[in-house]
Amino acid sequence: MNFLKWLIPSRNERELKKLWPLVRRINEIEAGLQKLSDDELRQKTADWKTRLSQIQDREELARTLDEILPETFAVVKNACRRLTERKTEIIVREHPLLWEMIPFDVQLIGGYALHSGRIAEMATGEGKTLVATLPVYLNALTGRGVHLVTVNDYLAARDSEWMGAIYKFLGLTVGVILHDQPPRVRREQYNCDITYGTNAEFGFDYLRDNGMAARKEEQVQRGHYFAIVDEVDSILIDEARTPLIISGPSVHTYDEQYAQWKPLVESLVRAQERLCARFLSEAEAMIKQLNPTDGSNPQNPEALENQIGMLLFRVKTGQPKSEGLMKFLEDPENLKLMNRAELDLHKDQKKVDLYREKEELLFAIDEKGFEADLTEKGRNFVSPKDPEAFVLPELTTLLHEIDTGPEPDARKRMEAKTKVQQDFETKAQKIHAISQLLKAYSLYQRDVEYVIQDNKVIIVDQHTGRLMPGRRWSDGLHQAVEAKEGVEIERETQTLATITIQNYFRLYQKLAGMTGTAETEASEFFDIYKLGVLVIPTNEPCVRKDANDAVYKTRREKFNTVLNEIKQIHALGRPILVGTISVEVSEQLSRLLKREGIIHSVLNAKYHQQEAEIIMRAGQRGAVTIATNMAGRGTDIKLGPGVAELGGLHVMGTERHEARRIDRQLRGRCARQGDPGSSHFFISLEDDLMRLFGSDRIVKMMERMGLEEGQELTHPWLNRSIQQAQKRVEQHNFQIRKRTLEYD
């Protein structure tokens, strides 16, 4: 097969081969530009702008841009050369940064891919940020505005200052859209030749312009000509599940309901904890019966095994993250019994037994579907004196009965109808408030899905690890979380305007994107956005050493090993970047390192203000940095003096993410541009990915090998099994995105 690959070049290789003559042409032109003065070089920008401003026809404009592409790319490359040779210092996010970048040949190819409306897949560290300057400069000459879309405000501000040095040197204007800017400032930024910002800011401005601006003068955007999306997989795939929503104060607000029902839901959650603890102690007693210490044979072992499996399944359904359950499942035999019980319950198409098992609980939690539902037992607990408390009557039937009833007085009939409607609304509000509070208590975890800052609940973006101030969960969920945390419950909102990310980006005449990881989702990019992917070769071969994943039974064993590896690598003087999946885990690991006396930095949603300084220090000798997936994108960790000789940056992942791309992004923080580096991922069977989407094959393999406490399992086959689990989640999320688009 490898022989055939060598014999028949891939489509990607054929595409690249066609582009090398263009690269040679750009370099020839650039050599000739070196004798021009700065003013003569800048004059080219003015001349092209004048020429392009006279072209109205879209096809003619596209032809002209293709025609001038070699010279415009050469001009950008020459401007970079001048800034480098003059050792120009640029102030980026209040830090002086020496300009030392001149586009490589492979970056020129990346620039062409973007101009032609494709996704350029470039390995992390290959300078995607610089690549974008080539097509951005070319298309900005049209005067129609080019939008460069980043994953967060920090990168938008950073890149507008950093890459802005090139554009300004060549005579173009650069703007940046940031959270909390007033409309007047936003309008000025959009009127620049080039505008940086996040997808959310661009999308919300579009919604405000088209849903809330009364006059054209109140609008801030001026059209959708060309957008380049940085980290395109994060924005067009990961975030595409969430539509952008502008909301206003709700006409009817029931915020007091959440505070009113909070004590009841709290007592319900505590009662469920006691119930699950009882099931676990019953299971423990049965396990002792199954394995008697006196060597005798247990009576009816099969029935005992079934009962143990059912009890463990109940706890998994009622309290899936219970520490007691995790401890039980450390024994592969118990895990096997629970999985077998679950399989038996799902065999019956009518799900009678499954329903009966769930009815032993007060509420059932579905982690995959992010749902929590009261059972009959739970409804009786919440409302023991009113069995109909959670049954909504048929309103139209009740109103019809009043209209056709014996009451002759029209006013009294109207009063009766008003009372029926009010009772119905009160009941519906109560059911809704209790349902949302139950979700808040059982599915939304502090320092994972959200953090508390300044007495407010702030959502944490699960893909970027960053805070999302100003964003609120809809449908009363945010109020439920506020009630749970005892902070001020803000007023409920109603949707005024909404658009999906997919449909917003379809507004652009031309769309392109960059990422280190697009090939895995190439078909989705093409199906939804009609974007092809061109994989750009690296400038220097990657010499990173990727160790096989280390798999442990428990989180405790996993973190002990992570700690030991940090100590070993730290003793060598190599810098270490430890990736975590949530704020909570990053702080837990930080406490362990403090106990060991290891000086380190923490980069998570709570400390995002120090991001630039932390990243600047992360590649220095002996540095230890713990980071959520905030550090996975757009951050360039440069190695300090003498670090390359020690082996470069060592990246450690404490868990596999739902999306393989995010793991690849973390790995890509090291061994950039031919530097040395290494990576190692650590996994436990208690991690969410393995619990929810993992395979029984891994458990069976660990069982066969009879692993002792603290022993790890590593094998390339195991890596494939973990990737299969990730693929299952990706497929699950792809179906959600398809449905989101269908209903927009």
Question: In which residue ranges do the predicted regions lie?
Answer:
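C-terminal accessory/connector segments of nucleic-acid motor ATPases
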Residues: 733-744
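C-terminal helicase lobe
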Residues: 696-733
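Conserved P-loop NTPase motor core
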Residues: 1-706, 737
